[in-house]
A protein has these predicted regions:
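Primarily the internal scaffold of c-type cytochrome electron-transfer domains
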Residues: 1-221, 227-301, 307, 504
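Residue-level recognition of tetratricopeptide repeat
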Residues: 301, 340-342, 374-376, 410, ...
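Alpha-solenoid helical repeat scaffolds
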Residues: 306, 345-348, 376-382, 413-419, ...
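Structural marker of alpha-solenoid helical repeat scaffolds
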Residues: 338, 370-372, 406, 417, ...
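TPR/TPR-like (Sel1-like) alpha-helical repeat modules
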Residues: 401-408, 456, 466, 470-501
Length: 540
């Protein structure tokens, strides 16, 4: 179709499968009381019915059918084809609250390693005239079993609106609309910006041209993103400075709307599709002295710290974004101080990301000794990774075996089954492969066969899994199966992302689209008082 190679343009299923919501993911930050077995539980809930197809699905004695409104984020139907107000309200209510906003703290300075002051609430920091701050904002996905937004991420429009007022007068903003409904392109968008081979944006349902993503700002289920906003307080400021931040959703951006609903000749199309508020927060900071106000947050303080750290962790790593990883670690220490073992586990995640394996092992040991201890399956997963990195393959295998057999009574009672997580299956194959290399003769042959079986199980769940195909190629070479090895090498070439080809497309788009170039940076700071407004062709 694309005259290039196999590419996944949209993938709801793995997003759900590898999440905590499904009960199959081993590495989620949060887990629900009960696993959600499929999409229907959320999007097609049971409703009582006397329809001839009604059944007693849940054993309650009540006949029901699955609701075929298919609750989701299609808020454009009423405007476009005149569906009922009731159906629009059902969709609106379904997505409200799905992206929580938390104005968590400030940094006194212009970059991400400036001194942090927070969390905000119940008290607020006092700002000083003339200082520059970063407003640290957390976006947390709530009540969903897949990445937000998923679906048609080329045209779904989710953005963050920020309004800063000083005694009622606007002094900073982001995410505003122009008179035609186009969103300021320098805003933070919760989307994926996907490019064609020549560096043009995929924005006309031209999936056959998908080549590479410039960035992907979608947020996994039970995870968070941390967004930095820069603000300079006026030198003569006094009184109260108020920051209001909202996450907003519109089914189609203006560019896409104008394609299938073109404006009259000589006119600019106006995007009048409804905008739904997904989440919001507001804080009033005193200037110089006094007390501010903050909206009440019902979420516990440890969770707010945890979400702040998760957002930073997802950005952090080696090199340019190491500062985000350091801040994430500091946040997880706060979670520990507030009495939750999640802080130790997430600190271990950060240490693994930084390559500090001994520190990760220490954090996991602390998590296991904590009262109450961390989730045992989480300890086993990250413990196995640490042991494998240290060459302790037998210890890693013991943990992985407990995981793949879900030997945790609490997990089983909640409907969890980790045997379908391809990351776990690949890890089992990798460890068995490593153990086999230590053997000779029949012992090695048996070990290679065992490793082979685990990678084959991965392909049952995910036939395009590049890790499994690569290892199966190596295994079959050692086992003397040259033809099978060649076949898996071919699949690996077919499914592996083409890193060498992406640079030209990305470079072309970054040059042509300054706002997207900024949003694709390793560390992104959005200026709330930006003076220039270079807008690329084709407003959104």
């Amino acid at each position: 179709l694309n005259q290039y190679r196999f590419l996944r343009g949209q993938n709801h299923y793995d997003s759900w499968l590898l999440s905590g919501v499904s009960g199959h993911g081993v590495a989620s930050f949060y887990y629900p009381p009960k696993a959600q077995a499929n999409c229907n539980g959320c999007h097609m809930p049971l409703v009582p019915s006397t329809d001839f197809g009604a059944r007693d699905f849940d054993g309650s004695g009540v006949l029901s059918i699955h609701d075929h409104l298919f609750l989701g984020a299609n808020t454009a139907m009423r405007s476009m084809v005149g569906t009922t107000l009731e159906s629009f309200e059902a969709h609106r209510q379904f997505i409200e609250g799905s992206l929580r906003v938390d104005i968590f703290g400030i940094r006194r300075g212009e970059d991400v390693d400036a001194p942090f002051e927070g969390p905000i609430g119940p008290g607020t920091p006092t700002l000083q005239p003339g200082e520059t701050i970063l407003i640290e904002t957390v976006l947390r996905t709530m009540g969903m079993g897949h990445h937000f937004t998923q679906g048609t991420a080329d045209s779904n429009q989710v953005w963050v609106e920020v309004d800063v007022t000083l005694n009622g007068q606007t002094i900073g903003h982001s995410g505003s609309l122009d008179e035609t409904g186009v969103v300021d392109p320098w805003s933070h968008f919760v989307n994926a910006l996907v490019l064609s081979r020549d560096g043009s944006r995929i924005d006309q349902r031209n999936v056959e041209d998908i080549f590479v993503a410039l960035y992907n700002h979608q947020i996994p289920p039970g995870a968070a993103d941390t967004v930095h906003y820069r603000l300079s307080v006026p030198d003569d400021a006094s009184g109260m400075l108020t920051v209001k931040i909202r996450t907003l959703y519109r089914k189609f951006d203006t560019h896409f709307l104008n394609i299938f609903r073109p404006p009259e000749p000589g006119e600019s199309g106006v995007n009048d599709l409804p905008i739904v508020t997904l989440g919001e927060d507001e804080v009033s900071f005193p200037i110089g002295s006094g007390e501010g106000t903050v909206a009440q947050d019902e979420h516990p303080l440890w969770m707010r710290w945890n979400d702040y750290g998760i957002g930073l962790l997802r950005k952090g790593g080696m090199g340019a974004v190491r500062g985000e990883l350091v801040s994430a670690s500091e946040a997880f220490h706060k979670v520990v101080d507030l009495g939750h073992a999640d802080g130790h586990v997430n600190l271990a995640r950060a240490m693994i990301r930084a390559g500090r394996i001994d520190d990760a092992a220490s954090a996991l040991s602390d998590a296991g000794r904590h009262s109450p201890a961390a989730l045992p399956w989480t300890l086993d997963w990250f413990g196995a990774r640490v042991n494998r990195e240290n060459g302790h393959y037998q210890e890693a295998l013991e943990s992985l075996t407990r995981l793949v057999e879900t030997r945790y009574p609490d997990a089983r009672n909640r409907g969890f089954d980790f045997s379908r997580d391809v990351r776990l299956l690949n890890e089992l194959g990798t460890v068995h492969f490593a153990l086999a290399r230590r053997e000779v003769g029949e012992g090695q042959d048996a070990g290679l066969e065992e490793a082979n079986s685990w990678f084959q199980k991965t392909l049952v769940e995910d036939p395009e899994n590049v890790t499994a195909h690569w290892n199966l190629a190596q295994l079959n070479d050692l086992m003397g199966n040259a033809e099978v090895a060649s076949e898996h090498r071919g699949f690996h070439r077919k499914y592996k992302p083409d890193d060498s080809a992406r640079d030209q497309a990305i470079s072309a788009h970054r040059i042509a689209n300054p706002p997207a170039n900024h949003a694709a940076s390793d560390i992104v700071i959005y200026d709330l008082q930006r003076e220039t407004n270079s807008t690329p062709p084709g407003g959104r």
